[in-house]
């Protein structure tokens, strides 16, 4: 997988497009293939260390995104591989894949593209 990685929270010009191992979802998580992500003002603040949420470095920014479930972790029974979901998690959206807690996901209709 690839992701915009923040290793130094000094702004977007320091983000690096980085190849990373594809993660495995843990208990209560799904692995999401990101299909679309938005760029919001909090995303800009987070990568400058100016937001109230300060993720541990390094991290993949991107707070709002949508994608397709690729794998489900233990304890996740209401989401299935191939299902389309929207996510609001705070981080992870600026990568091709991300593990995310099922509590941050909402399924959306297949007619939405």
Q: Model features per residue range: what roles?
A:
Residues 12-17, 50-51:
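Short gly/ser/thr-rich secondary-structure transition/capping motifs
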Residues 103-110:
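Conserved small/polar residues in nucleotide/adenosyl-binding loops
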Residues 21-38, 50-92:
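Glycine-rich beta-strand-centered segment in the early N-terminal region that forms part
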Residues 1-2:
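Extreme N-terminal starter segment of soluble prokaryotic enzymes
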Residues 6, 47, 70-71, 99-101:
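Short beta-strand-to-turn element immediately C-terminal to the catalytic PLP-Schiff-base lysine
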Residues 89-101:
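A structural motif shared across PLP-dependent enzymes of the aminotransferase-like
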Residues 42-44:
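Cytochrome P450 core scaffold surrounding the K-helix E-X-X-R motif
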């Amino acid at each position: 997988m690839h992701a915009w990685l923040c290793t130094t929270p000094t702004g977007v010009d320091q983000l690096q497009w980085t190849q990373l191992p594809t993660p495995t979802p843990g208990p209560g998580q799904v692995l999401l293939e990101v299909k679309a992500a938005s760029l919001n003002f909090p995303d800009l603040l987070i990568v400058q260390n100016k937001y109230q949420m300060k993720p541990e470095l390094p991290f993949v920014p991107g707070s709002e995104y949508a994608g397709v479930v690729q794998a489900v972790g233990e304890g996740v029974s209401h989401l299935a591989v191939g299902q389309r979901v929207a996510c609001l998690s705070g981080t992870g959206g600026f990568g091709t894949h991300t593990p995310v807690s099922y509590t941050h996901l909402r399924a959306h209709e297949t007619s939405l593209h």
